[in-house]
């Protein structure tokens, strides 16, 4: 007979009360690192035309644009390796230490892009050095977003995880706005000729002081409550093992959590393809294909992104009330239905209609980004959360990162300006399947962690809800038993009379 593990009833002392001050510091530090990651993406996306001329001067404009965007996409090949590396270390040594390392690598590699001489100076080594810097970024970013989202999720109260997690992608959008704004400002001040000569380097130099600030904030943070609980549960022998070797079983991840892996991959693909299409490819699309000036296209995207900043936390707040799944499903349906109308407006050559088309895509994107950072960490238990999420996330981003290059190639090869819309419709189907099949995670404790609350009163309410849920399950079981008793009685009455 199997021995069942004795289960202790949960008490008020088992509920983790989250310190507001520590929570604010965690969100600030995590969001700043994410902002710096997307600052680079924003800068790179908006100076792609300049980089094409600096590093690929012999090609025609279309090839220059595709080559520059390809350099943006290639580092995504290295991100899964970074995700696996930092994911294992994050589950082994903790989240805080890894986030300090990733921001250092990211800021230094971004800064170094600004130091690379042009093709005219060092020839083929210029694009090679650019690619190496981008690959270093890709390696560090492989552990950045997943680590930051886990850090915020493990610090957040269960009832506010959606709202708190939404600030992570608020940082992404803010970083993008800052990067794009810096490009426009410098380009306007120094003029296009000077910008191509040396002005494009300045935005990359800004990454270093941002990285120093981020490192200071992250270094001062404490480890997350959920990971600390995991360590505290280990016996001394296991504690030593945690320091000496990884406790991550990729067999367990692949066999026991494959549904969560697929849900994670689907959600990240839907979110990031839309993200890169709108925020990285659209500036090039507007300038190269629709012949708007670079500054004009950038200003439209910046205005859209500023609007997204206000919508982002609202989506997170609403997801705490209505759940994460409705937003994924609603966003996917809207993306499928509105992709073609949005691009018809974008191709109208009327500034107001262009803005309306981009705004439609932006609101749809907010449906995904508002819930992603709170949804993904809740799919996996504490002891494998970083490794599993980093692996799934970066495999997905590997696909999504090809979006700018693939979209540019599709438009150039087909001469059909609606190709990006068709691409988004395919992605919308993936998002819809994911939203329908994924489990709801809102207002529930993270797997492998005790409930988390903002204060004692909320902790008592959580215990009350837990009690009511158990009572409801008991009632359901009693009902099932009663129905089985009725079925049993009917079967007994149907016994054939073999003694007559």
From Swiss-Prot:
At the top level of its lineage, which domain of life is listed? Bacteria
Record key words, sorted = Cell inner membrane, Cell membrane, Coiled coil, Membrane, Symport, Transmembrane, Transmembrane helix, Transport
Transmembrane residues, as ranges? 38-58, 66-86, 98-118, 122-142, 170-190, 195-215, 261-281, 298-318, 326-346, 351-371, 391-411, 417-437
Q: How does it sit in the membrane?
A: Multi-pass membrane protein
Coiled-coil stretches: 453-498
Question: Where in the cell?
Answer: Cell inner membrane
Q: Which residues lie on this side of the membrane: Periplasmic?
A: 59-65, 119-121, 191-194, 282-297, 347-350, 412-416
Sorted alphabetically, which InterPro entries does this protein's record hold?
H+-coupled_symporters, MFS_dom, MFS_sugar_transport-like, MFS_trans_sf, MHS_symport, Osmo_CC, ProP_C, Sugar_transporter_CS
Question: Which Gene3D superfamilies does the UniProt entry name for this protein?
Answer: MFS general substrate transporter like domains
Q: What would be one Pfam family of this protein? A: Osmo_CC
Quote a single Gene Ontology cellular component term: plasma membrane
Zinc as a keyword of this entry, yes or no, is no
UniProt source species: Salmonella typhimurium (strain LT2 / SGSC1412 / ATCC 700720)
Q: Does the keyword Transmembrane helix feature in the UniProt annotation?
A: yes
What's the family? Belongs to the major facilitator superfamily. Metabolite:H+ Symporter (MHS) family (TC 2.A.1.6) family.
Major location, coarse class?
membrane
Give the Cytoplasmic compartment stretches of this protein: 1-37, 87-97, 143-169, 216-260, 319-325, 372-390, 438-500
User: What job does this protein perform?
Assistant: Proton symporter that senses osmotic shifts and responds by importing osmolytes such as proline, glycine betaine, stachydrine, pipecolic acid, ectoine and taurine. It is both an osmosensor and an osmoregulator which is available to participate early in the bacterial osmoregulatory response.
Protein name (record): Proline/betaine transporter
One term of GO molecular function: symporter activity
